[in-house]
Amino acid sequence: MGVAQSNTTLVAPQPKGIIDPATGKPVGSNDPFFGEINNELADKGFLVTSTDELINWARTGSLMWMTFGLACCAVEMMQVSMPRYDVERFGFAPRASPRQSDVMIVAGTLTNKMAPALRKVYDQMPEPRYVISMGSCANGGGYYHYSYSVVRGCDRIVPIDIYIPGCPPTAEALLYGVLLLQKKIRRTGTIER
């Protein structure tokens, strides 16, 4: 009727990687990305990456965009900042000054009189700078393509990184364009674009 005693010492297993103090479990234990990082940290004690990957990772999480709303597409551009879509959760926050912006969203019809102002604002943005062309009018003139006063695509004035089609494109389409831009930034090196 006695309890058998063992002479072996019981040792609690050591958790691997970065431990969340609130739960006591490894951070992101269900996420494959964090699982890979935790395994590498537990194995080596440090992470190995290139400077390009680190800089591009930081860029994608802190993109500041400047609005260049010219027509009805600007309403959808404003909607993407509202709580339903909340683009700021992806590290994409609005700024009012071109000197603090990384991304310019051209939304709407670009006229010949507005084209020099667009180029001037683009030139004031620091490098690296990116441009999203939003809507049919910004992409190729749209409904006003044959008008004498409309530029047939803002790519004639500034280089475009992402085109978002639609008249007007939905907020989901703009959000998808932002995610594509982040993917493009992660894919490129820091020296060449």
From Swiss-Prot:
InterPro entries to which the protein is assigned, alphabetical: NADH_UbQ_OxRdtase-like_20kDa (IPR006137), NADH_UQ_OxRdtase_20Kd_su (IPR006138)
The organism's place on the tree of life at top rank: Bacteria
Similarity remark: Belongs to the complex I 20 kDa subunit family.
Entry's EC annotation: 7.1.1.-
Keyword vocabulary terms for this entry: 4Fe-4S, Cell inner membrane, Cell membrane, Iron, Iron-sulfur, Membrane, Metal-binding, NAD, Quinone, Translocase, Transport, Ubiquinone
Binding residue positions for [4Fe-4S] cluster: C72, C73, C137, C167
Keyword Oxidoreductase: no
Binding partners and assembly: NDH-1 is composed of 14 different subunits. Subunits NuoB, C, D, E, F, and G constitute the peripheral sector of the complex.
Membrane topology note: Peripheral membrane protein
GO molecular function terms listed in the Swiss-Prot or TrEMBL record: 4 iron, 4 sulfur cluster binding; iron ion binding; NADH dehydrogenase (ubiquinone) activity; NADH:ubiquinone reductase (non-electrogenic) activity; quinone binding
GO biological process, alphabetically ordered: aerobic respiration; electron transport coupled proton transport
Organism: Rhizobium rhizogenes (strain K84 / ATCC BAA-868) (Agrobacterium radiobacter)
Cellular component terms per the entry's GO annotation: plasma membrane; respiratory chain complex I
Cofactor(s), names only, from the UniProt record: [4Fe-4S] cluster
Reactions listed under catalytic activity: a quinone + NADH + 5 H(+)(in) = a quinol + NAD(+) + 4 H(+)(out)
Function recorded in the entry: NDH-1 shuttles electrons from NADH, via FMN and iron-sulfur (Fe-S) centers, to quinones in the respiratory chain. The immediate electron acceptor for the enzyme in this species is believed to be ubiquinone. Couples the redox reaction to proton translocation (for every two electrons transferred, four hydrogen ions are translocated across the cytoplasmic membrane), and thus conserves the redox energy in a proton gradient.
Annotated protein name in UniProt: NADH-quinone oxidoreductase subunit B
Keyword Mitochondrion belongs to the record: no
Entry's localization field: Cell inner membrane
Cofactor mode of binding and number, as noted: Binds 1 [4Fe-4S] cluster.
One Pfam family this sequence matches: Oxidored_q6
